[in-house]
Amino acid sequence: KSSAASDVYKRQGLIDTFALSEEIHERFYHGYHDVKLPHKFKIAVGGCPNNCVKPDLNDLGIIGQRIPEVNTDVCKGCKKCAIEAACPNKVAKVVDRKIQIDKEACKHCGRCVGKCPFHTIEDGAYGYKIYIGGRWGKKVSMGKELGKIFTSKEEALDVIEKAILFFRDNGIKGERFAETIERIGFENVEKQLLEQL
């Protein structure tokens, strides 16, 4: 297990990485100690999209998120928009005198929340983005993100459990999770992990 423990104290930290990694450790390392997997299974937790501990380079990675809740009814379309200025990825733009956020490109860093003096983005749900199939070393594989941001910690933990059990049931001895996913197909694995959530 690894976590960006300092994210708890960093301004950008969106989730308590240490507490979550401890819960993951207790539930899955201790709780699943007798479960035999085809190979080691590494889990990393990062507190924000800055990606300090590279969760996407682990078998399963979690990255803290904050999904902005936009109220365009109060947007004044300011020429010097505080939300636009706060967005490090430049995906928030004033168009036709209303703020618009490119939802596909938004990294959910939460930096836009609370910046507007007219309260256009006053809040945002906290969540967890999950990557699967990453690895580092002789063979590098960038993990792929599941097509959902989980706003419930329990739901995110359930996905971890499903991933571990999927690897147990479908992995070949000596095979890393990235290879299992490649062999079976990311879309097939993703579908099974997201079923009944």
Regions found by a protein language model. Name each.
Residues Y126, G134-G171:
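A hydrophobic, small-residue-rich beta->alpha segment in the mid-to-C-terminal subdomain
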Residues D34-K40, V95, D169-R183:
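Flexible, glycine/charged-enriched surface loops at secondary-structure junctions
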Residues N50, G61-R66, A125, I130-W136:
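A domain-level signal for the structural core that forms small-molecule/cofactor-binding pockets
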Residues R11-Q12, P49-P55, K139-V140:
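Short, well-ordered, mixed-charge alpha-helical segments that flank or form enzyme active sites
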Residues K1-A5, Y9:
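Single conserved hydrophobic/aromatic residue that forms the stacking wall/gate
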Residues V35-P68, F186-N188, Q192-L194:
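A gly/ser-rich beta-alpha-beta helix-loop segment of oxidoreductase catalytic cores
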Residues F28, H33, L37-K40, N58-G114, ...:
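Ferredoxin-like iron-sulfur electron-transfer modules
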